[in-house]
UniProtKB/Swiss-Prot annotation:
Gene3D superfamilies, alphabetized: 2-C-methyl-D-erythritol 2,4-cyclodiphosphate synthase, Spore Coat Polysaccharide Biosynthesis Protein SpsA, Chain A
Function recorded in the entry: Bifunctional enzyme that catalyzes the formation of 4-diphosphocytidyl-2-C-methyl-D-erythritol from CTP and 2-C-methyl-D-erythritol 4-phosphate (MEP) (IspD), and catalyzes the conversion of 4-diphosphocytidyl-2-C-methyl-D-erythritol 2-phosphate (CDP-ME2P) to 2-C-methyl-D-erythritol 2,4-cyclodiphosphate (ME-CPP) with a corresponding release of cytidine 5-monophosphate (CMP) (IspF).
Site (Transition state stabilizer): R15, K24, H269, T368
UniProt name for this protein: Bifunctional enzyme IspD/IspF
Pathway connected to this protein: Isoprenoid biosynthesis; isopentenyl diphosphate biosynthesis via DXP pathway; isopentenyl diphosphate from 1-deoxy-D-xylulose 5-phosphate: step 2/6; Isoprenoid biosynthesis; isopentenyl diphosphate biosynthesis via DXP pathway; isopentenyl diphosphate from 1-deoxy-D-xylulose 5-phosphate: step 4/6
Reactions catalysed, as given in the entry: 2-C-methyl-D-erythritol 4-phosphate + CTP + H(+) = 4-CDP-2-C-methyl-D-erythritol + diphosphate; 4-CDP-2-C-methyl-D-erythritol 2-phosphate = 2-C-methyl-D-erythritol 2,4-cyclic diphosphate + CMP
Positions with a binding annotation for 4-CDP-2-C-methyl-D-erythritol 2-phosphate: D243, V244, H245, H269, S270, D291, I292, G293, T367, T368, N369, E370, F374, R377
Length: 397
């Protein structure tokens, strides 16, 4: 008995996050992308003889990078505009192999338990499809277009379908070909096509851990599940930043985006916010992304008198693109004058709004230089900043 698997990874759904971070199947889950976990579930099962990975035409490079160590163990083909077309492409790619049975699986389900595969394999026969299902526990409501409840749907005999769904190969191929010839393309899964074609579908108990990553919260759930029973080192990075500016004649200085009345101002190309400059460098350091001068050269006139919050937002966007989460920032201001204490609260509140973290994760403190050096002579202010950012995955071994 030969069993093949088709893994569908051609989707372009954006519900699990912005596509600027890549399709969900290539987002990191632990030390490798979601799709790698999915592939390994089938590779590690001895009964699976062939694996077809169906990807989006634009994803050949990102896929090659993601599955570099696995690509020799499967066949990669180009999918179509819909899930149904992609499945048919995968089935056609197996026509020369002619397996007895074929699994059809969502690439965004990375936790297929070996027990579930075994249960499917002991249940398969040449006449039926096998569908893992979970009972519906929530109360179901039928809602109108105006968001009003029309009726409550009884939960009896209602189930949620999972993948992998397993079918006799020749039957499911014929069903998909017939659906395409009939221009029937409104099916949401393969068991629905099988039902329409007349293939009996037998259900077996699904696995609650076999989640599909659809929404942003699902990625966090998946990461938590992966951590269970595993001793790994999360990818927590720390960056440091330092900046200094001299005084010149003026009426206020800007620190952490807050204007503080003073008989002088800080001299600089931008608004010379020494605190935000140091913090921006600290955040950039967690991505190895250079320093503030790399991104905003002081020789560029467009940054003359610019708000340093622009620089900070830029660093935050770089972190967001890498799916990082700012966990903590610590800023030390070194100055004889002015007194920072009266403004610490409002400075912290401003950083809270910019960084989108709670105030207990923000530390702003000040010290003098004990009358030593240029700071002791009241010629300027220096700032030290440390930032801690958590990124998905773990420290590479």
């Amino acid at each position: 008995m030969s069993i093949a698997a088709i893994i569908l990874a051609a989707g372009r759904g954006s519900r699990a996050g912005s596509l600027q971070n890549g399709p969900k199947q290539y987002r990191f889950l632990g030390r490798e992308p979601v799709i790698c976990h999915t592939i390994r579930c089938f590779l590690q099962h001895p009964a699976i003889t062939n694996i077809i990975l169906v990807i989006h035409p634009d994803d050949y490079q990102i896929c090659a990078n993601a599955i570099a160590d696995l690509k020799d163990h499967l066949t990669i083909i180009e999918g179509g505009e819909t899930r149904q077309i992609s499945t048919l492409q995968g089935l056609r790619a197996l026509k020369n192999v002619k397996p007895n049975y074929v699994h059809i699986h969502d690439g965004a389900r990375p936790f297929i338990g070996n027990e579930l595969l075994e249960q499917i394999h002991t249940s398969i026969n040449h006449k039926e499809g096998i569908l893992p299902v979970l009972s519906v526990s929530d109360t179901l409501k039928y809602v109108s277009n105006t968001h009003h409840v029309l009726e409550t749907i009884p939960r009896t005999n209602l189930y949620r379908a999972q993948t992998p769904q397993c079918f006799p190969f020749e039957l499911i191929l014929a069903a998909h070909e017939k659906a395409m010839q009939s221009h029937k393309q409104d099916f949401t899964d393969d068991s629905a096509i099988a039902e329409w074609f007349g293939i009996p579908i037998r259900t077996i108990p699904g696995d609650p851990n076999n989640i599909k990553i659809t929404w942003p919260a699902d990625l966090e759930t998946a990461r938590s599940y992966l951590l269970k029973g595993m001793q790994i080192f999360p990818d927590i990075r720390t960056g440091n930043g330092y900046d200094v500016h001299s005084f010149e004649d003026g009426h206020y200085i800007t620190l952490c985006g807050i204007k503080i009345p003073f008989e002088k101002k800080l001299n600089g190309h931008s608004d010379a916010d020494v605190a935000l400059h140091a913090l921006t460098d600290a955040l950039l350091a967690t991505q190895g992304a250079g320093d503030i001068g790399t991104h905003f050269p002081p020789s560029d006139p467009q940054w003359k008198n610019a708000s340093s919050e622009i620089f900070l937002h830029h660093a935050i966007e770089i972190i967001k693109k890498a799916e990082g989460r700012i966990a903590n920032v610590d800023i030390t201001l070194i100055a004889e004058k002015p007194k920072i204490g009266p403004y610490r609260h409002i400075m912290t509140e401003n950083l809270m709004k910019i960084l989108k973290i709670s105030t207990d994760r923000i530390s702003i403190k000040a010290t003098t230089n004990e009358k030593l050096g240029f700071i002791g002579r009241e010629e300027g202010i220096a700032a030290l900043a440390t930032a801690t950012v958590i990124y998905p995955g773990e420290i590479p071994k």
